[in-house]
Amino acid sequence: MYCLPNHLFFFTFDRKWSSNFPKNGGVYLVFDKGVLIYVGESANVKERMKDFKRTVNHTFRRKLGKHLFKGATITNGKFNDEIESYLNQYYIDNISVSAIEIIFGRTEIESNLIEKYKKSGILNSESKRNATQFI
């Protein structure tokens, strides 16, 4: 997915950043310089976005760090301070997120988007869920 959605929020470390997202369940898309690199779902997207900046809490941040720093290791839920600092700046310079509220079927939508874009280099791993695939 190389087009930008209508509601794209560029990452900031401002506490109000997560208020851009719905409190309800939904699917969110993470973009690196406008290119889709991660698909996620949550029962509360706003709360999930609060976790977005913490390596210990968010799979995307761990995967991005390992992708950018081949061989980087995580200790006590985070990278070393130098890598964490670089990731913070990388988020600010490159990362944006879009989300849509979806009450029912969000895991199926997430799974289908991952399946559709897995060959384009997204950082999602194979789904551990046994969601029905609708293509």
Residue ranges, per PLM feature:
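Short, exposed beta-strand/loop patches in secreted or surface proteins that constitute
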Residues: 1, 88, 115
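GIY-YIG nuclease catalytic motif and its immediate N-terminal context
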Residues: 1-54, 80-82, 100, 127-135
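Conserved short loop/helix modules at catalytic or binding sites
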Residues: 45-103
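C-terminal charged interaction modules
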Residues: 104-135
